[in-house]
């Protein structure tokens, strides 16, 4: 997008860290969350500061060096954002998977109202699985939101079927955005890095007997 002459910002939810509860209090905390879920509330896993920072200690350095970020609190996700941008785009990896994308409706651009004329685009959006994991209420809400999009594309072929069957929207099957870059783009990113000293990083999304043997 930048090479096409566009100014691009990534809207990033501000992470709200939760204090660690004492051990004796944990059964009450989790029971409360379970009851909230049983009565139709949203299941949200708490994010604790120290593990979160440890996990992201390398990725955050890369992200903030190469991507222009705009962190937003929950209150800042509102229709006033429409005046700051010409187009809103959502994508790609598992942005439409309820267990990861919270609150889910935000990833369908629910914070925009119907008064603005900003085009809404989904590029290589992913449901994360071959089956729709949305609840009945989420389907109703997100169907209305998705039908307001100017263009919808998804990363997996199964996603086109979900869009048509569940949401009544025609979606194109496109490449993941990481594959839009050339080999040279990635070589430039690592040109100043020291060669590995025999270490191998393995990223396993779904553990299987074969990957365990590996």
Indicate where each model-derived feature is located.
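Generic low-polarity alpha-helical segments
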Residues: 2-5, 188-191, 214
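Aromatic- and Gly/Pro-rich donor/ligand-binding loops
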Residues: 2-144
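Redox- and metal-dependent alpha/beta enzyme cores, enriched for Fe-S-associated oxidoreductases
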Residues: 206-214
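Amphipathic alpha-helical segments that form well-ordered structural scaffolds
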Residues: 62, 162, 213-214
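Hydrophobic alpha-helical packing residues
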Residues: 1-2, 163
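A nucleotide-sugar donor-handling region in carbohydrate enzymes
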Residues: 71-72, 78-87, 96-100, 124-205
């Amino acid at each position: 997008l930048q090479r096409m002459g566009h100014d691009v910002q990534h809207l990033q939810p501000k992470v709200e860290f939760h204090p660690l509860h004492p051990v004796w209090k944990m059964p009450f905390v989790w029971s409360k969350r379970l009851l909230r879920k049983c009565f139709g509330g949203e299941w949200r896993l708490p994010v604790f500061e120290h593990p979160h920072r440890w996990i992201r200690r390398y990725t955050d350095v890369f992200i903030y060096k190469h991507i222009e970020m705009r962190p937003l609190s929950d209150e800042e996700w509102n229709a006033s954002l429409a005046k700051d941008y010409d187009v809103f785009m959502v994508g790609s990896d598992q942005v439409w998977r309820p267990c990861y994308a919270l609150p889910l409706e935000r990833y369908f651009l629910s914070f925009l109202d119907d008064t603005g004329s900003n085009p809404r685009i989904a590029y290589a959006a992913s449901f994360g699985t071959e089956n729709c994991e949305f609840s009945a209420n989420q389907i109703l809400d997100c169907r209305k939101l998705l039908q307001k999009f100017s263009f919808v594309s998804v990363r997996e072929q199964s996603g086109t079927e979900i869009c048509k069957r569940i949401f009544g929207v025609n979606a194109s099957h496109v490449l993941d955005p990481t594959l839009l870059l050339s080999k040279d783009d990635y070589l430039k990113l690592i040109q100043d890095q020291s060669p590995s000293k025999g270490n191998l990083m393995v990223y396993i999304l779904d553990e299987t007997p074969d990957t365990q043997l590996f």
